[in-house]
C-alpha cells in the first residue's frame, strides 16, 4: 500500500473521530452493536493500515504504560474493551465518544472514497450521468465556516475595544451600545457572500487563460456556496427539531397555567363567598349559638364519618362512607331546616323594616366589588372563536336580556315570559342565585361596575335594584320557605306607565326609556325621579316597512326607544324612527342627530370617539362624534338585534347560528359559529376584554374567546 492510500485511510479515521465529537448530541445506541456498520469500516481501515512498521510504532507508544498487558497492541485484543478504558470516564462513554458516526457523515465517507479527494464537490461532469450526488465532508464544512468565524472574532475584538474606550460613559450610553450589539448580532448571523464577478468583462474577454482561471475561481466559489448550503440545511433541521420541542413545552406549560388559573379563580370565588356569608350573618345577627342543633348535627356527622373511615369495615361500602360526610348546607331534619329558614326570613324582615332608606344603606364598602381580573386571562391560551363554556336550557323560552361584569365573573340573564332573574357563576358554570319580583317579562338589565348590584326593567313598567350578594346568600337557604320577591330587591322605581325597554346608569344617575314615550332620569341615592323627557313630539312612526322581531323576542312592533346609553351629562338614544340622538341631560335638549338608518334602532353604544348603532334595516353604522359624519357601514342579510364593542373588536348578533366579529385594528371580519349540532339562533351578545357571552332563542348561553 502506497503512502497516498495510507494517508487516505488515516484521514477517514480522523474524520470519524471528529464527527463523533461534533455529533454526539444525536448518538444512536445501535452504534454499540457488534455488527454495526461503523465497526466494519473501522476494521477495514485498520487492516489497510497494517504492516510491521505500524505495529512497531504502536508498541513503542504503549511502552511507557504501567502494566505490561496494557502495552499489547490494541488491535490484537479479542474484545477491544481495554482500548476504551481510561481514568476519566467509563469504557462505555469513551466508546460512544470515539466511535459515533452519523448517517450523513458515514455517507460522506463512503462517497468520498469514490470521488476525487482534492477537487471538491463539483466536477465538469453531469450528476445524472454519474448516478451519485456529492455532499460536503466534515473538513469542507469546517473550511467553509472559517470566514464566518474570522468575521465574528474580528467583530468581538471591535466590540471589546469600543467598550474599553467608552470607560465610565458606558452607563450613560447604554441604549447606544444595545443598538450596536443588536447590529453586530444581526451581522454575524447573516450569510457572507463571496460572489463578486464582472459578467460584462467575461462577455468581452477573448483570453482562454483568463477564462480558465476565472472558471476555476467560480468553481471554487460554487463549491463553497454548496458547502454553506449543506451546513445551513443541517442548522435549519436542527432548529426545526428544537422549535418543535419548545412548542410541546409551551403547550404543556399553557395547560398547566390554565389549571393554575382555574384554581386561582375558584379560590378567589370561594374567599369572596365566605366574606359575603360572614357579612350576611353579622348584618342580620344570624350567628349560631354554641348549643345550636345544627352544630350538634355537624359534630355528630363528623364523628360518624371519622368512625366509619377508621374502622375499615369490609361491609361498609364507599357510597355509605360518602353519605356520612358532614354537610354544612343541608340538614337531615326537614322541620329544623324550615324553622331555621323562617327564622332567618323573620330577622331579615325586621332588619329591613328598621332601616329608613335601604337604598342609601346599600352604598358602602361592604357591597363594593372585591373580585379582580387574573393577571393572565384564560382566554389568551385559546384560539379566537373557541366556545369555552356552555349552559344549556338556562331558560325555557329563549334568552331575552343579559349582562355580565367581567370575564369568568357574574352573569345575569332573563328569559322571555320569565319573571325571574338567574345569576350564574361563569367560572363554575352554575346558577348561584335567583331573584323574583317582576310581574311580567324582564326586557333590559345592567350590572353595576362598582357595586354588586343589578338594575332590571320589565314589561310591568317597574325598575328594580337588586343586591347580588344578598340574593346569593338567600339562595343557599331552603327555597320552599323563603319569599324571594322582596328580600334581595333594594328599591323599586314605578313612575313609568309603560313597559321599560332600555336603561343605563353610571355611579350616580339612572336613565330609563319606556313605551309610554318618555325618558326618565333617577337619583340612585334617594330613588327619586329628577327629570322626564317627553318623546311624543320628537319620535314619529317611520314610514318605511317595519321588520317585526321574532315572537319570542318582542311584541309585534319595535320599541319606541330600542336602546340608550348615558355617561355623565351625555345621553344617546336610538328610536324606532331610525334616528340616533345625542342629548344634553342638563338641559334636556337634543344637541346632535345622526340620520341614516331606515328602520328601528335596536342597540347602540358610544365611547370617546365613536358611536355605533345597529338597526332592523340590516346594517351597523359607525358615527364620528367629533364631526357627526358616518365613518363606517356594515350591511348584513338579517336585522341587527344586538351589538357591543371596545377599542379592539365589534361584535353583533343578527339572529343566525353565529355572531359577527369585526377587528377594528386589522379591518377584518370573521364570525364565531355554533357547532353543527346546535341550530339555535343568537339574538344577544355581550363583550368585554376579548370575552363574549351569547344568548340564543332556545335558552342556551355560551361563552366565547374573541
From Swiss-Prot:
InterPro entries the record matches: Coatomer_complex_subunit, G-protein_beta_WD-40_rep, WD40/YVTN_repeat-like_dom_sf, WD40_repeat_CS, WD40_repeat_dom_sf, WD40_rpt
Region (Disordered): 160-181, 305-328
Chain coiled-coil ranges: 227-264
WD repeats: 394-434, 437-476, 495-534, 554-593, 596-635, 637-672, 677-706
GO terms under biological process: endoplasmic reticulum to Golgi vesicle-mediated transport; intra-Golgi vesicle-mediated transport; intracellular protein transport; mitochondrial fission; mitochondrial genome maintenance; peroxisome fission; positive regulation of mitochondrial fission; retrograde vesicle-mediated transport, Golgi to endoplasmic reticulum
SMART domains named among the record's database cross-references: WD40 (SM00320)
Compartments reported by the entry: Mitochondrion outer membrane
Membrane topology: Peripheral membrane protein
GO cellular component, one term: COPI vesicle coat
GO molecular function annotations of the record: ubiquitin binding
Pfam family, one: WD40
Keywords assigned: Coiled coil, Membrane, Mitochondrion, Mitochondrion outer membrane, Repeat, WD repeat
Function comment: Involved in mitochondrial fission. Has a partially redundant function to CAF4 in acting as an adapter protein required to form mitochondrial fission complexes. Formation of these complexes is required to promote constriction and fission of the mitochondrial compartment at a late step in mitochondrial division.
Homology family: Belongs to the WD repeat MDV1/CAF4 family.
PANTHER family per record: COATOMER, COATOMER SUBUNIT BETA
Protein name listed in UniProt: Mitochondrial division protein 1
Organism: Vanderwaltozyma polyspora (strain ATCC 22028 / DSM 70294 / BCRC 21397 / CBS 2163 / NBRC 10782 / NRRL Y-8283 / UCD 57-17) (Kluyveromyces polysporus)
Lineage: Eukaryota, Fungi, Dikarya, Ascomycota, Saccharomycotina
Gene name tied to this protein: MDV1
